[in-house]
Amino acid sequence: MRNLLPLFLSALMFTGCAASQKQENTYRRISMEEAVQMMENESGYVILDVRRPDEYAAGHIPGAINVANETIGAAEILELPNKDQLILVYCRSGRRSKEAAEKLVKLGYTNIVEFGGILDWKGEIEA
């Protein structure tokens, strides 16, 4: 019995180490207020509008780039070459931004933050 205890503890330790290394890459969901705060305090981020081009043209958050959700995964995203860059993702209501964030993570992007839809945006809109 005494010989089994060290063996059991070793197995438990290795299992714990393996589990911590297998952490899945995921995106973060934040509120609109947190997104505004992040835009004010961070630098080097990209604001990604994943609505259709016609929706983007009708009005978008200043400085946002447009890559329609439907096109994510179809080809390399030339507008987003740095997969470690902070990317703030939004759409109209939050459904497409969630889908886009999930796709971006699967494509290897590591710093994705999804903050819902422009319907909740209280700041300036650029057309």
Language model features by range: what are they?
Residues I47-D49:
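Hydrophobic beta-strand scaffold positions of dinucleotide-using enzymes
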Residues R2-P6, C17-M38, Y45, D54-L86, ...:
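Rhodanese-like catalytic fold shared by cysteine-dependent sulfurtransferases
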Residues L7-A11:
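Classic N-terminal secretory signal peptides
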